[in-house]
Amino acid sequence: VFSSPILPEFLTGYECVKFFMDINSASIRNPKPLDGYFEEMSIAPEDRDKLLKDYSHGMKNKMQMLINIIAQPNILLLDEPLTSLDVVVAEEMKNLLRSLKDGRITIFSTHILDLALDLCDEIVLLSHGELEVVEKSNLDDHAFKEKIIAALKEESYA
């Protein structure tokens, strides 16, 4: 799932989901009725018939996640899943990510350290082009957290 949603904006929400389900019907396990998926993502009935081009950024992100819920991938790769979302949608997305991590590998990039602490079993920090495993127990230490933030600041201004 991309931080900037990529969707067929000439379709409505219903058309997009139906099209996806039709072309992937052989691989979708235990499909639900369309409305069930929209309800799971808190997409209101009046929004389901709107063209995707008229959806807000947050609604487009919800549609991308809806497609992933239907596809049920074993590995879910997300780029900044909460970027540009309002507080309500961000909280919904965080709860969804928490529920989706059961039974699959979820990998996501984020600049929100508290989000990583809340949702991740393991945290890896990308600094100066190198990956470094961060022990979550160290993140309870305020000084260690400050060290990470300082390193990230240094890198972003370099």
Regions found by a protein language model. Give the residues of each.
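Q-loop/switch helix immediately C-terminal to the Walker
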Residues: 9-25
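Helix N-cap at the start of a conserved alpha-helix in ABC-type nucleotide-binding domains
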Residues: 87-89
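Conserved ABC ATPase signature
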Residues: 51-58
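A short, surface-exposed alpha-helical micro-motif characterized by mixed small hydrophobic
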Residues: 116-118
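Conserved H-loop
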Residues: 103-109
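Catalytic Walker B motif of ABC-type/P-loop ATPase nucleotide-binding domains
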Residues: 76-80
